[in-house]
């Protein structure tokens, strides 16, 4: 699929970062010069990023990261025919994925990683408890068959779910999964510190599974939400059918878009009664500016850019 012009790369690594300000500066300079967009999160505990650029600059980025001593990145690539990000953002935070649990040593405590090829066997065992670690809005559009939805609004709520629902299951086989694997790293490490004995996690996350396992053998049902302008992907990493409501930032289905409550860029069935008249008017004005920008060939962050815009 590398004949598609844009590479989308997601990666993370838990490692102690020194000179974090300098690392941010070097990455910002490199990505800006090479027209790479997306988000990089840096923290004392490591790096977490989803970026996109033309194929060659992303190859150069991988070499740059090695030069910066990120030798053991957990990374995943996919390819697209348009730029899925609007801008470059590099942030320094307390954690590379927010869990609000200080002093958690992920390298020491993370669960056993299970490859895509072995995942179906594990989750189809009667004694396995299968848990989706993602947030509720992500689970709603797709998940693994027979998985448990913890109904969390954010990742840090997962700890409460454990205490309320799995506190008596510390000796059971618990298999967990998330989009790319990073949330499972923290969740499984936390569970190990709480006495859970048999914690397994899907290596590379859902995205790796969707790429590795053919549709006819897949236990995945629905689509997988991704945090970029693709919105969702399906089995074998094919483009999904969901769009993003730019009013509430929730994924919306084809049926949602047929609803009387749906107006592109302004409202959907999930938010039509939650936004004010002023908010809706502002969204209408934004839509108008997008159309003007399209006609004049001007930059607008809500327009999907193609390789010709990067030449």
Give a label for each model feature.
Residues 2-112, 135-174, 182-311:
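Rhodanese-like catalytic fold shared by cysteine-dependent sulfurtransferases
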Residues 126:
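Glycine-rich active-site/cofactor-binding loop and its immediate structural neighborhood
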């Amino acid at each position: 699929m590398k004949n598609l012009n844009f590479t989308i790369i997601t990666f993370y690594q838990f490692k102690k970062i020194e000179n974090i300000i300098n690392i941010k500066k070097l990455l910002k300079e490199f990505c800006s010069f090479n027209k790479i967009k997306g988000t990089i999160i840096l923290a004392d505990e490591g790096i977490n990023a989803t970026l996109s650029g033309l194929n060659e600059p992303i190859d150069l980025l991988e070499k740059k990261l090695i030069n910066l001593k990120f030798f053991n990145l957990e990374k995943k690539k996919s390819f697209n025919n348009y730029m899925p990000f609007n801008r470059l953002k590099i942030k320094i935070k307390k954690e590379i994925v927010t869990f609000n649990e200080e002093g958690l040593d992920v390298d020491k405590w993370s669960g056993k990683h299970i490859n895509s090829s072995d995942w179906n066997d594990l989750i189809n065992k009667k004694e396995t408890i299968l848990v989706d670690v993602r947030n509720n809005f992500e689970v709603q559009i797709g998940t693994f068959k027979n998985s448990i939805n913890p109904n969390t609004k954010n990742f840090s709520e997962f700890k409460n779910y454990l205490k309320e629902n799995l506190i008596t299951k510390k000796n059971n086989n618990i298999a967990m999964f998330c989009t790319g694997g990073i949330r499972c790293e923290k969740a499984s490490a936390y569970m190990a510190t709480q006495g859970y004995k048999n914690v397994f996690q899907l290596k590379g996350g859902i995205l790796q599974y969707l790429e590795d396992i053919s549709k006819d053998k897949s236990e995945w049902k629905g689509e997988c939400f991704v945090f970029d302008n693709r919105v969702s992907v399906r089995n074998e990493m094919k483009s999904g059918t969901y769009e993003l409501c730019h009013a509430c930032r929730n994924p919306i289905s084809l049926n949602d878009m047929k609803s009387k409550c749906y107006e592109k860029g302004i409202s959907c069935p999930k938010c039509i009664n939650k936004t004010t008249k002023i908010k809706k008017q502002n969204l209408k004005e934004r839509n108008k500016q997008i159309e003007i920008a399209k006609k004049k060939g001007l930059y607008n962050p809500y327009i999907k850019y193609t390789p010709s815009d990067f030449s």
